[in-house]
């Protein structure tokens, strides 16, 4: 059996359910054994009743996990005193688990109100000792749903429940008049059985469910057109909060299922549905529908070549893992000899990009992980290599599960991780007219410390001199580092004990203000040295703890003109590593592959097509009438780009039909002009409610991971006043 959610309530007849499906574009079979409708009228009553005492979000977030294919019921118990009266009148229904002394008293045909032993037994008696599972007015909605998903009968002391009908344990006269019996559609009279769920192939209900992979939501639903406000509220929250784990099913695919046809699938999601249902399928091939987030990668085999006195020798054989084929083709890498250093000893840009995009190196002799020494001074340095081959070609998904919503990205890398160099390389990359990662889209946690007077690193330096009892920075370095530049554990521990309050009391307050300000100015990439920096600053973006295949401490030692010198930076590096959480790092390449590879893939698909029909933007829309009230010219509506999209024309046409307007924000259009062309003013965006789920943008389309918020001005008129507006997302393209 499968469950399909459709946002409407009809009578509990298969013919009505079939008509409902057809109204949403589904060609349904006329066999009533195929389709069964679950009447969820009573759930609407429960929702309305529950919202008086619980947060709407808590109730909806719980109900979305209800397994509607599991038969269950709440059994409403009378108040304890009335329950005992019922037992006294009907001794045969007293449960076996009741204390035998209490059972014996209840079977006596006399007035027990003045029986001291009976009253003592009553006071000791707990409903939870006899009836399990038991929910009450203090039970959370999620616990209620978990209970009815796992049991056929859940006992309750309250009628304020959600997700299943209520069956009366006793005749109605035993219940308090204060209990609400206005919920007639929820209450099953005493002695009447619950109608069983039919054994149809498809059960149609009102509310989406995440309880099982076989629970689907019809994708052709227009949320804004749902007439019932409670159902509309439910769908709006589920679509915004749980969008990435909902199982959408298209009318065409459901039609094929109902008509018992071989399924025609055209996307990874549809293929997944066919596999879940164990149904045969064939893939509809289309050049326009290519999953650009599935990327070909290989392992690059190379040898470290040493040349001495004209003689060539191989000192080490390495494997560079999980390198994108598209980047290898972009660089033009072949089986040949390469010098990977510039004249100044630094790595070439292409080698740095290649290694950063990888999942590290393996020494083929020891089969252990190998870290590259950034120094150009022997021993154990790499200057010349010979690429000997490519192996283990495979396909990987570069869209991580954690990137569920379109939000800023916090990238945590240790000091000495070549951030400046790799950002310079990415700043120069442009694909399909879109810059991969403009430098203005990147902020660094160092900027927080540099805003302080004195700077954070200078303040730390002066305080550490006092802890070490020295006057100079050189003496401080000698005090904490040994001759081999490895810190003395006890002394480094003393410095760390003072580092924590400095980071908490000095750095964190400034950081909170900095990130609140910078993240309202754009969906930016933020670099930090420790994830604790961002966590303590209430950073709300995706947080990625990353690592690179280089010895970062050595890179620190060869960088000059840093605060306190390279040795003090080394000490700070040790402290930041201690400051970090215990979360396991992932390779920096996993983020870089997401930034670069889909765009290179898309370029192959649409590189020769007209840019006007393969380009689109999603942004915040402000009607020109609102702008004119604040002195703007009103030549056109205001539009602040949120996401830049490149995709084939047919994919853009599909994206155009999606419900973008369900996401809203407060947009502050400033009077601060950006230098250069085109003419733009800066804007700030504070998103209200939920961020846009990444799933809303098709896997057949590329979108910008970062964005600086600007409002474009197509005219030369004077600018207006800085003002705030309520705005919703709209889709904009040149398509007719």
From Swiss-Prot:
Q: What does this protein do?
A: Minor inner capsid (core) component. Displays NTPase and RNA 5'-triphosphatase (RTPase) activities. ATP is the preferred substrate for hydrolysis. May function as a cofactor of polymerase lambda-3. Associates with microtubules and plays a role in the formation, structural organization and morphology of viral inclusions, where the assembly of cores and the replication of viral RNA occur. Together with mu-NS, recruits the other core proteins to these inclusions.
Keyword Transport assigned:
no
Q: Which GO terms describe its biological process?
A: symbiont-mediated suppression of host JAK-STAT cascade via inhibition of host IRF9 activity; symbiont-mediated suppression of host type I interferon-mediated signaling pathway
What keywords are annotated for this sequence in UniProt? Capsid protein, Host cytoplasm, Host cytoskeleton, Host-virus interaction, Inhibition of host innate immune response by virus, Inhibition of host interferon signaling pathway by virus, Inhibition of host IRF9 by virus, Interferon antiviral system evasion, Viral immunoevasion, Virion
User: By what name is this protein known?
Assistant: Microtubule-associated protein mu-2
* InterPro entries the record matches: Reovirus_Mu2
Q: Which cysteines are joined by disulfide bonds?
A: none
User: Gene symbol?
Assistant: M1
Which molecular function term from Gene Ontology is one that the record holds? Answer: structural molecule activity
Q: What is its main location?
A: virion
Q: Quaternary structure per UniProt?
A: Interacts with protein mu-NS; in viral inclusions. Interacts with polymerase lambda-3; this interaction stimulates the ATPase activity of mu-2.
Which family does this protein fall into?
Answer: Belongs to the orthoreovirus mu-2 protein family.
